Regions:
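Extracellular, disulfide-bonded carbohydrate-recognition/adhesion ectodomains
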Residues: 1-181
Length: 181
């Protein structure tokens, strides 16, 4: 939107009599856009942080990239990320934006304030063990686990709660400006 305002403000100064703008979600013209260090998976872009940190540092690291901790809005998105990690042979645990910091027992995605509704929890999870598990990560939760699942863990520097993290870039928007001279 800021780009539109700047261009619209300068367009008459460049001798354009008429112009129109159009904003579309995504990249409908498949324009080449350098999204480094993000990796495209389906229609979204992700960074897989390699350092093991607590949930708060993971969140800060994503914000430094102008992104958010991953939010699984659909089971398909979760499955695509799990398939990507499996294809790389990565069975590490990764922080998501999910938590119940606002109200214990009610888990929301921090980045969009939506309830966590996907059914990808590990058996008997979330359990808020010890009354201190409030942030959601994905991983092979138990020794017998055969797939990525969600689990709640302490958000802070607990010895067993330092994980890698996944950042998700904001959805792209394409601004088209047509001018007539």
């Amino acid at each position: 939107v800021q780009l539109f305002l700047v261009v619209a403000g300068f367009a008459p100064g460049f001798g354009y009599d008429k112009y129109t703008t159009h904003i579309q979600n995504g990249n409908p013209y498949n324009l080449t856009v350098d999204m480094t260090p993000f990796i495209k998976i389906n229609e979204s872009y992700y960074v897989f942080g390699q350092t093991k940190v607590n949930w708060y540092v993971a969140y800060e690291n994503c914000r430094r990239l102008q992104s958010e901790l991953v939010t699984f809005e659909t089971a398909e998105e979760f499955d695509a990320i799990a398939a990507f990690l499996n294809a790389r042979g990565d069975r590490s645990e990764h922080w998501t934006s999910g938590n119940d910091l606002g109200k214990t027992g009610t888990h929301y995605w921090f980045s969009n304030a939506q309830l966590v509704t996907i059914k990808r929890w590990a058996p008997k999870q979330p359990d808020n063990a010890g009354g201190r598990e409030h942030c959601i990560h994905l991983g092979y939760i138990y020794g017998y686990s055969t797939e990525f699942q969600l689990n709640d863990r302490p958000c802070h520097n607990h010895a067993s709660s330092l994980f890698k993290y996944i950042c998700e870039a904001p959805k792209q928007e394409t601004v088209s400006i047509v001018v007539w001279k």
